[in-house]
């Protein structure tokens, strides 16, 4: 993940888009822009899926990753995001049922099993 975050950091530097030293420096305008960019790419993904366009799907997913990595930088999480992701994965795996099988809702959403626990992200961030 760090390789790709560094690539986006290079882009930010080349295009004079400095990343804040503290996530609290991110303005409402800046985080709303990040949200709009992701929303645009989500819509492009949906459209590409509807047209069975694998190139468009790959492009939209790649652009989403690019925006996500940039957003990670904007919030100063580049040094902790892998640990955060691992903790979320650990929590997601705790959703299995007592029999070790997934518990699924009718629409395919995975439900929380009896052993589910929330990810402890505050521990990672020291918050």
For the regions a protein language model found, what residue spans apply to each?
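Flexible "arm" and connector segments at domain edges
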Residues: 1-127
């Amino acid at each position: 993940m760090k390789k790709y975050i560094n690539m986006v950091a290079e882009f930010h530097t080349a295009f004079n888009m400095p990343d804040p030293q503290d996530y609290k420096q991110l303005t409402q305008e800046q985080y709303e822009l990040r949200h709009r960019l992701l929303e645009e790419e989500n819509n492009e993904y949906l459209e590409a899926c509807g047209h069975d366009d694998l190139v468009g799907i790959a492009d939209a997913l790649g652009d989403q990753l690019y925006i996500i990595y940039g957003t990670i930088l904007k919030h100063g999480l580049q040094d902790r995001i892998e640990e955060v992701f691992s903790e979320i994965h650990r929590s997601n795996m705790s959703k299995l049922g007592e029999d070790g099988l997934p518990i699924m809702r009718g629409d395919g959403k995975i439900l929380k099993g009896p052993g589910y626990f929330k990810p402890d992200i505050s521990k990672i961030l020291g918050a």
